[in-house]
Amino acid sequence: KSPAMPVPGPMGPMGPRSGPQGFPGEAGAAGAMGPRGPAGPPGKNGEDGESGKPGRGGERGPPGPQGARGFPGTPGLPGMKGHRGFSGLDGAKGDSGPAGPKGESGAPGENGTPGAMGPRGLPGERGRTGAAGAAGARGNDGAAGAAGPPGPTGPAGPPGFPGGPGAKGDAGAQGGRGPEGPAGARGEPGNPGPAGAAGPSGNPGTDGAAGPKGTPGAAGVAGAPGFPGPRGPSGPQGAAGAPGPKGNTGEVGAPGAKGEAGAKGEAGAPGVQGPPGPSGEEGKRGARGEPGAAGARGAPGERGGPGGRGFPGSDGPAGPKGATGERGAPGAVGPKGSTGESGRGMTGSPGSPGPDGKTGPAGPSGQDGRPGPPGPVGARGQPGVMGFPGPKGAAGEGGKPGERGVMGPTGAAGAPGKDGDVGAPGPSGPAGPAGERGEQGPAGAPGFQGLPGPQGALGETGKPGEQGVPGEAGATGPAGARGDRGAPGALGPAGARGSPGSAGNDGAKGDAGAPGAPGAQGPPGLQGMPGERGAAGLPGLRGDRGDQGAKGADGAPGKDGPRGLTGPLGLPGPAGATGDKGEPGPAGPVGPGGARGAPGERGESGPPGPAGFAGPPGADGQPGAKGEAGDNGAKGDAGPPGAAGPTGAPGPQGPVGNTGPKGARGAAGPPGATGFPGAAGRVGPPGPSGNPGPPGPAGGTGKEGPKGNRGETGPAGRPGELGAAGPPGPAGEKGSPGSEGATGSAGLPGPQGLAGQRGLVGLPGQRGERGFSGLPGPAGEPGKPGPSGPGGERGPPGPMGPPGLAGAPGEPGREGSPGSEGSAGRDGAAGPKGDRGESGPSGAPGAPGPPGAPGPVGPAGKNGDRGETGPAGPAGSAGPAGPRGPAGAPGLRGDKGESGEAGERGHRGFTGMQGPPGPSGSSGEQGPAGAAGPAGPRGPAGSAGSPGKDGMSGLPGPTGPPGPRGRSGEMGPAGPPGPPGPPGAPGAPGGGFDLGFLSQPQEKAPDPYRDRDLEVDSTLKSLSQQLEQLRSPDGTRFTYSVLEDGCTSHTGTWGKVGAPDQEFGLEVGPVCFL
């Protein structure tokens, strides 16, 4: 025997995806310090610093605005007597005196002119609600509304009875060419054609698209072993390995390079205020300072002395008429004085008033004298005693602004104001200059795993290996994907005609052919028995939205529906944007209602209210009277296609068809034999890192690094908050007076001063110039009552009073036509800002971000000496951001730090995106009906809204009362034959049925029944139009009723008609369906 050739066995199963965890690699060198992080948020404001020394007084500011009017000063001494003034205007009418004795009737006066229309009175208190008015007469019917938009498609109605087959329609017009049909079944191979002459060689064509992969040919003879294939593609990435064992202790690392300066620490808390220092020596006299800024507005000065008397002002415009004051109580009746003579001399200076005399007893009433003629106007009497202050008149128009007063002296410095709120953080200062390099920072935490690196360049092709030993046939591989279609080859010479091949396997089932012509109509089946009424079917699927129907004719206006119920509360609106801080809140809630007012007068009927919401549908009405016969309806749509008729006889053989298109590529043949294995693939990319192994023991301490370079000066910290005021230091010695400072800039106008105190008594004024006419004097004594004049003419009608209360609602008007859907309202104003919600629970930690691409290793810096901290430099202007430095080599893994303290609460997050609307809230309880407001005018009809979405099918309504009996229909065509029913069980003999057994296919039945076929057919024909197909309830048996006289019924027991293999017919007489 020849020695056995070692043949490679079949490919073994794939090894586990994940190998064991590798040993930890050596620690990498420490990475370079990362770039400086972004600036943190502004720190808290520092505490307030100590108060600065007071600045020098500014220049005197411009005079402040005129202060509020001071209290009246004490009256000055009487001035010298002025010139005699012009006669004053007549005094206002005095209060009515007590009724005097009745005078003689005077001569009637002339009719007065009608008075001007009085001002509109204030509205009276609201009266009690009057009794409901009588119902108004029913309004006229409204005009028919415009047709509403078509309603949504109604739910599908119950299936109608099957219609009879329609009449055959006319031949349709020739249709356009249909779309390309699906590829036909693969045609049989045609006979080979004769060989064509070889054509001239064409230009090389462009590469065609790759053709579909052909069916595999029969397995060829095994070829010689091929050369080793090219190197295979990288294998799939291996699964993550298990964690490796704990690594050995690493060697002591070399001293790391000095790190960059660390980020600046946060500003320290302000230190405790130190004790006050001792008083310093008296300083030298300082140089003259710059003028200080304008001081704070001073407090108002004391009230100045009264100024000299000004010139009398011109008369101001008359104020508006004041409201009528309450009527004063009548004074006591004084004794009647004697009539003085009319004086003509100058008015003497007033004497000092004498003491009040006691009131004398009332004298007896004298007889009525006749009224004398009116005497001349007497001299102006002494001013009367000041009366009680009248009620406050309406506010007069503002007087002209006074002239600007002289600036008051600067007031004393006010008390310091309250501490202001913490200001908003100021803008970030410019970045300081870069600091010197700081000490090396600690090693950073290990970075995230980097992304896989890019694929390396392909290596050079290896030399061909020696020919390998042929392997055993491998297992059948899966069918390859279909290749692209190749370019067509050149036409070869025709081969010799081959011998006929063996019959092929049956081809795949072809697509369904076009529907055949309808078969001839079969004989009508026999009428079945009526089945029980089936249960209601499930609601059908929602149909596609129908096309918009044509606009219907205007319907007659419907009757008024009752007012609908208040709708449920709407869904909550979207959250409004956060509003600005609101103004102070509105006035408090309205106080409790007052006592009920007197009833007002009945108001006029209000305008008709807007149309109410549509009421719920009314209950089913009584059945209407039988309508007249309608016109014949239009020809109905074609009914559903009838059941397929029996297959017709085959037609004559048709002519040979054209050769079909080339058949589709056949199904893939059996897989070919396995090829030789290809050369080993390239090494796949490394699998993902395994879980980190447990930390190794700590390495030995590295050598101390050389002293770092002096770090750069950190940026100046923010100013601390104002410290608490220190205790006052001891008083310093008084300094020598400074030289007079330069005049400061004009201060801001001071605030309006407070009202001054009451001034001192003024000196006697100089003699004034002659005054203008005096104001009307106080009221004179009441005159005697004059005779009553004749009644004046009726004045013009007063202005229209305020509208009365709304009358009782009238009967509801007829329901107007429905308005079209209004456009959507504008978004409501944002609601008030809600209380701040409690902090939500901490969110779950986010998934780690994708690893960044590893950067190239940066060069290690030289070790510098450690510098001392320099003084804070001035803030430089912000430099441009430098490019991001290269990432350093990874540092050693640090020990796990302890848990840090909870960080400060973060800033409030930005407002999130608007969430989806919440679920509908539960309907609130129905609130009490509000008081009916006055009806507004009827708005114009809105434009028609777009039709709403199709509504869900409503629940089936209650069964209506039976309608009137319809006309008997015409005889319909015969229906298709029904399937033969299953045999029933034998039954008891029934009454009233005339059962004939029609044995059409057999010759056993007696002839007389055959003559009645037509009779039965016509009876069944007339019934088939009016009955649904009758089916037995469970397919095996049915209950039948025997009808006797008229429509009384007798229900028999379960029974069957006919034997299992018999056909039977029924002669149905008058039928009552129960």
Curated annotation (Swiss-Prot):
Comp. bias intervals (Basic and acidic residues): 45-59, 893-907
Any idea where this protein resides?
A: Secreted, Extracellular space, Extracellular matrix
Give the protein's recorded name: Collagen, type I, alpha 1a
By sequence similarity, the record places it as follows: Belongs to the fibrillar collagen family.
Chain residue ranges for the region called Disordered: 1-1010
The Gly residues compositionally biased stretches are: 163-181, 301-313, 588-597
By its UniProt entry, which InterPro entries does this protein fall under? Collagen, Collagen_superfamily, Fib_collagen_C
Could you list this entry's UniProt keywords, alphabetically sorted.
Collagen, Disulfide bond, Extracellular matrix, Secreted
Pfam families (alphabetical): Collagen
Q: What GO molecular function annotations does the UniProt record carry, in alphabetical order?
A: extracellular matrix structural constituent
Biased-composition ranges, Low complexity, are: 14-36, 129-147, 182-225, 234-272, 290-299, 377-392, 469-530, 563-578, 611-647, 661-683, 715-742, 803-823, 871-890, 920-956
Instruction: Please state every residue range assigned to the domain named Fibrillar collagen NC1.
Output: 1014-1074
- Record flagged with keyword Lipid biosynthesis: no
Gene Ontology cellular component list: collagen trimer; extracellular matrix; extracellular space
- Comp. bias (Pro residues): 1-13, 149-162, 685-697, 847-857, 974-986
